[in-house]
A protein has these predicted regions:
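Active-site-adjacent structural elements that line small-molecule/cofactor binding pockets in enzymes
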Residues: 1-267
Length: 267
């Protein structure tokens, strides 16, 4: 199971430090989410920046890292321009960019751009077809790299998971403990799904993790408990794990340091 983090922090300097510790400690993928309007659970360097721009910056600072967006709200993005951005970033990251796309979770983001929340699935399906056609298109500038375009994964709820299984695309689930993920993973694989990834919030220590609008389903605990939790995700068939280690300098640093120094050597 491949493991990476979102370098969420209070300051730009700590976002860089988190990335350094992670990459040097074997947490080799740097993930960012996506959003349009201000969200009290994703502020500043903890998820508010434009994701593709920040990922390009991180790819330049840490050229051995894989980078990924989890997940781009596809109905809010022009597929032609996203294909250009994705192929560019894939080249900048040495062939190490993962493009995860979703129909969208926040109604206000979509409605602010004139898209009814109920229409997002239809818009997503049309845009996904366009995106998959455009990414390998050699007439675009830049077209795909010599190793091909970046991989496309899907993220979302049950309907999107079914799309992923039907299309043979990887699916990224999110915000579920191993117990909660178990039945989801079984449904995905029973439907013919081929590759399951997961995004979760994992923080060192014993404390409650609450959000303003996000129900995190966060996992907290010791290094030993982390080893057990990550092992359980792997047993469920998760092939790629994206960890949100916190949303401030102190909490994120503490968690990433423990993951790199004590957890990864045991996996």
């Amino acid at each position: 199971m491949r493991i990476g983090i979102s370098p969420f922090a209070t300051t730009q300097e700590t976002a860089l430090e988190l990335s350094r510790i992670a990459v040097e400690g074997g947490l080799d993928t740097l993930w960012l989410g996506d959003g349009y309007l201000a969200n009290p659970d994703f502020t500043g360097w903890a998820g508010a920046m434009e994701s593709l721009a920040e990922l390009a910056w991180l790819a330049g600072r840490y050229p051995t890292a894989r980078v990924g967006i989890a997940a781009a709200i596809l109905p809010l993005r022009d597929p032609s321009w996203l294909a250009k951005q994705a192929n560019t970033l894939h080249r900048m990251a040495g062939g190490g960019f993962v493009l995860v796309v979703t129909p969208g979770f926040w109604a206000h983001d979509l409605e602010a751009r004139g898209i009814a929340f109920a229409d997002r699935a239809a818009v997503f399906d049309a845009s996904l077809a366009d995106l998959r056609r455009l990414l390998p298109d050699e007439t675009l500038s830049p077209g795909p790299s010599s190793t091909g375009p970046p991989p496309v994964w899907l993220a979302g709820a049950a309907a999107t998971m079914a799309r992923a299984a039907a299309l043979g695309l990887p699916f990224l689930s999110s915000r579920a403990t191993p117990d909660e993920l178990g039945p989801i993973a079984r449904r995905f694989f029973d439907a013919g799904g081929e590759f399951l990834a997961h995004r979760t919030r994992l923080e060192y220590g014993e404390h409650d993790v609450t959000g303003n609008v996000v129900d995190w389903h966060a996992i907290t605990g010791s290094a030993g408990e982390f080893v057990d939790t990550l092992g359980r995700y792997a047993e469920l068939g998760v092939g790629d794990l994206s960890i949100i280690p916190g949303q401030d300098d102190a909490g994120s640093l503490r968690t990433v340091e423990i993951l790199a120094a004590e957890v990864m050597p045991q996996l």
